[in-house]
Amino acid sequence: MSIPASQLPPLTEATLWQILNDELEDATVNQLLWHCLGYRYDPHTQTWQSDRVPPEWRQDYPEPPDFMGSRPAIVKLTRSIPPAHKQLLKEQLGFPGYEIKELTPRRTRRATAVNWLLSYRATQAEAGAK
């Protein structure tokens, strides 16, 4: 099941910090990522539509993956961030990273999700400027 796009939180700095600070549910973080990747839930057929999803994602994940619970999915997300966008978490949010003692798979996945969302936002802005 999916939250309607109109009810997803906006991709603002506040939302991104909520993700980093573990103030948004994993399900909401996943659904933000799914929406940005192009996955759409059809409540009438109760199926996921992936016609807007890039082929490299659709091939591996015909249905949206659980990014917060799946290492392979989050690794693919990490690898899909263009090199020019790898530091957006630091550059745009001033995120200093975690100390070694604070590192957990959950926090790392949330930081990856935020960096990918920042990359998505930057890519959309670049496409709109052309």
What residues fall within each predicted segment?
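Low-complexity intrinsically disordered segments
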Residues: R58-K130
